Design a protein with these regions (language model features):
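Short, well-structured alpha-helical segments in soluble
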Residues: 57-70, 86-89, 248-258
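Short beta-strand elements in bilobed, periplasmic/extracellular small-molecule ligand-binding domains
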Residues: 32-52, 134-140, 195-201
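N-terminal basic/disordered segments at the start of proteins
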Residues: 1-37
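Long, internal scaffold/assembly segments composed of regular secondary structure
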Residues: 222-313
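Extended hydrophobic packing segments that form well-structured cores
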Residues: 371-493
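C-terminal catalytic subdomain
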Residues: 289-424
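Periplasmic-binding protein-like
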Residues: 70-79, 98-100, 262-267
Length: 493
């Protein structure tokens, strides 16, 4: 996928001066051997400088990993470690940092070979807090070479999201639609996250679209679309307009991303879009999202931000859906009950008009926006990509600056069930354990909008760490709590 950072982690071993430097160096070598044997060499770099209680060593290591092109850092305590210089390294490194430490290897070498990194990690964490330095520390940060190799690998998607956010520009078109206050987007928190935003009017976009009339690239783009749609190409007459619109967006990105490397788009799709452009943009949105450029509907700025984070974490296509409607009783009784271990309240339908990428649908068909067509001519509502969403594991999540301009987030893992929806749009039957309680005491209670981002797989662990790292307070980092774990607002009776 394009529009994603490549992560390269610089691994720097550190050593307390009253411990053998060789202990840290040899443990670093063992860590790198364990990592490269299991995961390869692409995403890591072994820094030859071991920091031994020295700010000069720290500067040398910093320069070395910069020269090697590292954009993420792993500080590895091979022994107790030098708490000042090791945390200064994280302070001066321009990128996400993690701290891990070496466990003792054998009962037969607990004199000269004992490193005490278990103790050193405590001092490291204290010094990080003193200096207000952000760092990712895994759940069990002290481990064997093999265990630390796994921790290092788990850091890659976390680092990719953090690096991506630091170089992201969101491009929005138009204000949110009338009567859609839920999609309000206080932008202060975007700047706090290091994200840039360029806000444009629909008129700017319409002008750019008209300037692409007759663009010589349109026929080739139409052929791409025809190949993707195959037998589902039921509205071939709208493809030239959709191709023109896709070229407009791609050209806008190149002309407007400025000094930023990555882009996400919050686009308008109603109420005037379809009457003026002559189509709905859903299919084009799905195609760009498949390229790694998330495009949200209804000018949902934090929606496309959430999609971008999920794209970074999963390195895969995501989507944005309405948490939309209940599953009818008869459908639950006939197709779910007794076949899957979910209550009726655990299930719901996630839907959007047609913005989910074709690779995430069981089959796809180019259609028209049925809801809009109730009040508009059908021909101006063409452009939706419809089909049931692929069954399998999912993570439903969202990062949001709510009406009070505070950062909040939620994460809930579940699945799309292999049950036909018998409905329209891009839609699936979702099942999330304890969804009913989560819906009431997180989504409603904490004023989240009706849009949720969907990653195709279970990525809750990495997303949770990303949200913590970027500053979401843990009391506002919500998840679907299991039975017996009451929400603060939940009635215990």
């Amino acid at each position: 996928m394009s529009n994603l950072p490549e992560v390269k982690i610089g691994v720097v071993a550190v050593s307390r001066d009253c411990f053998p430097e060789s202990l840290s160096v040899n443990r670093r070598k063992a860590l790198m051997k364990a990592y490269t044997e299991k995961y390869g060499t692409d995403s890591v770099y072994e820094c030859p400088v071991c920091i031994v209680e020295s700010e000069i060593h720290m500067v040398q290591a910093l320069e070395d990993i910069k020269k090697a092109g590292c954009n993420a850092l792993c500080v590895y305590l091979g022994n107790f470690g030098p708490e000042i210089s090791e945390t200064l390294l994280a302070k001066h490194f321009d990128g996400p940092a993690m701290f891990i430490a070496a466990a003792e290897e054998t009962q037969n070498d607990l004199v000269g070979g004992r490193g005490d990194a278990y103790c050193g990690m405590l001092n490291a964490s204290y010094n990080l807090k003193l200096r207000n330095i952000k760092a990712y520390i895994p759940e069990n940060p002290v481990g064997t070479a093999a265990e630390c190799a796994d921790m290092l690998h788990e850091f890659i998607p976390i680092a990719r999201a953090i690096v991506g956010l630091s170089d992201l520009k969101i491009i929005s078109f138009g204000p949110r639609p009338l009567n859609f206050l839920a999609c309000n987007a206080p932008i202060k928190q975007l700047y706090n996250l290091g994200v840039e935003i360029e806000e444009n009017s629909e008129l700017d976009l319409f002008e750019a679209f008209k300037k692409h009339d007759g663009d010589e690239r349109i026929p080739a783009k139409v052929k791409e679309m025809e190949a993707e749609l195959g037998a589902g190409n039921h509205k071939p007459e709208v493809l030239p307009k959709l191709a023109q619109y896709e070229l407009t967006l791609l050209d806008w990105i190149e002309a407007h991303k400025g000094y930023r490397k990555y882009v996400a788009i919050a686009g308008k799709c109603w109420p005037a879009f379809q009457t003026q452009f002559g189509f709905v943009p859903c299919y084009v949105n799905s195609r760009l999202t498949g390229m790694g450029i998330p495009v949200s509907c209804e000018v949902d700025i934090y929606g496309c931000l959430s999609e971008f984070i999920g794209t970074c974490v999963s390195a895969d296509t995501v989507t944005l859906l309405d948490i939309n409607n209940t599953v009818p009783d008869d459908m639950y009784e006939e197709s779910i009950k007794g076949k899957f271990n979910y209550t009726h309240n655990d299930t719901f339908m996630g839907f959007h008009c047609g913005n989910t990428n074709s690779k995430k649908l069981t089959s796809c068909n180019m259609k028209y926006q049925m809801i809009m067509a109730r009040t508009l001519p059908e021909e101006v509502t063409q452009g939706t990509l419809e089909g049931d969403i692929l069954p399998g594991d999912i993570t439903f999540y969202r990062l949001q600056s709510t009406a009070d301009s505070k950062l909040r987030a939620y994460i809930a893992q579940g699945e799309v069930l292999p049950v036909a929806t018998r409905s329209f749009g891009g839609i699936g039957i979702f099942a999330i354990p304890e969804m009913g309680r989560f819906y009431r005491h997180v989504l409603i209670e904490k004023n989240f909008p009706h849009h949720g981002a969907v990653a195709f797989g279970h990525f809750g662990k990495a997303l949770y760490e990303v949200f913590k790292y970027i500053g979401v307070p843990v009391e506002d980092l919500n998840f679907n709590q299991p039975k017996g774990m009451l929400y603060p607002t939940e009635n215990p009776f």
